[in-house]
Amino acid sequence: MSWLNTKKASCWRSSGRSATKSVTTNDAGTGNPAEQPARGAKQQPATETSRAGRDLRAAIVVGLSIGLVLIAVLVFVPRVWVAIVAVATLVATHEVVRRLREAGYLIPVIPLLIGGQAAVWLTWPFGAVGALAGFGGMVVVCMIWRLFMQDSVTRPTTGGAPSPGNYLSDVSATVFLAVWVPLFCSFGAMLVYPENGSGWVFCMMIAVIASDVGGYAVGVLFGKHPMVPTISPKKSWEGFAGSLVCGITATIITATFLVGKTPWIGALLGVLFVLTTALGDLVESQVKRDLGIKDMGRLLPGHGGLMDRLDGILPSAVAAWIVLTLLP
């Protein structure tokens, strides 16, 4: 998620992609005068889009639908939250794996998907120990699995026997993915286990949403000073200020009424959630720049892939779990 909700990945790799052919237009704006609509003909209204070229109507409908489902789950059947996190882990992991493989990385898919489910579901009986055990086992299996994928990508050695090609870069990308999605998701699952767990999930989610909305609105209206132009040119310091104001305000309210914390603790939590949301967004923006893509997927109309919505939520979930564990 981003303050401007615009994640624009440039710097495409020089991989032989052909440039998009341009069409010479006349004054009417069409490529062929014969194809111009007849005068007085009824034209379809243009779809309303954001500055990122997304369908705003679809984005709002999808966002509200997901929000209503999550609210119902957390209020009436909070333990189903773990199943939702498990499904999100599966989908988001698959999205990133597909993008990495498109970029030439050889990623062990099966152990990542199974290990991710283990990391999430083992939190139910064992808590953080189960999450770390599932994560550790997943990493070990992935490292071994990649060794036996050497027939697909090999490099000659001086002795004549093939050796795994790009093993280090592939395993590094795999471990990064294992931390980024399955491990972070497992901390999100653990938020719901305490007695007031649903309140903590609401507090974290509302803080992230308020940060995004506030940053987007202020950035669009007043954004002039780029924050990190080499990673995300659309983000501005003005937008970040809007994120801070809205995120802190929302967290003070939710922390006070949902989890019973004092306003000053709510303010500190708000700062923490805004920072983790911003860092998560920047990390995904950098990953997409490295891969030369705009979105991780197309699952959610108007949003992109599921991972494009989880980028700020996942590190915020880790931060929320740490605070929940340490605070009395």
Curated annotation (Swiss-Prot):
Catalysed reactions, semicolon-separated: a 1,2-diacyl-sn-glycero-3-phosphate + CTP + H(+) = a CDP-1,2-diacyl-sn-glycerol + diphosphate
Residue ranges crossing the lipid bilayer per the database entry: 58-78, 81-97, 103-123, 124-144, 173-193, 202-222, 239-259, 263-283
The EC number(s) this enzyme carries: 2.7.7.41
Compositional bias (Polar residues): 15-29
UniProt-recorded Gene Ontology molecular function terms: phosphatidate cytidylyltransferase activity
InterPro entries, per database record: PC_trans
Cellular component per GO, a single term: peptidoglycan-based cell wall
Subcellular location: Cell membrane
Enzyme class: transferase
Topological category with respect to the lipid bilayer: Multi-pass membrane protein
Region feature (Disordered): 15-50
Pathway: Phospholipid metabolism; CDP-diacylglycerol biosynthesis; CDP-diacylglycerol from sn-glycerol 3-phosphate: step 3/3
UniProt keyword annotations, A-Z: Acetylation, Cell membrane, Lipid biosynthesis, Lipid metabolism, Membrane, Nucleotidyltransferase, Phospholipid biosynthesis, Phospholipid metabolism, Transferase, Transmembrane, Transmembrane helix
GO biological process: CDP-diacylglycerol biosynthetic process
Family: Belongs to the CDS family.
Record-given protein name: Phosphatidate cytidylyltransferase
This protein's encoding gene: cdsA
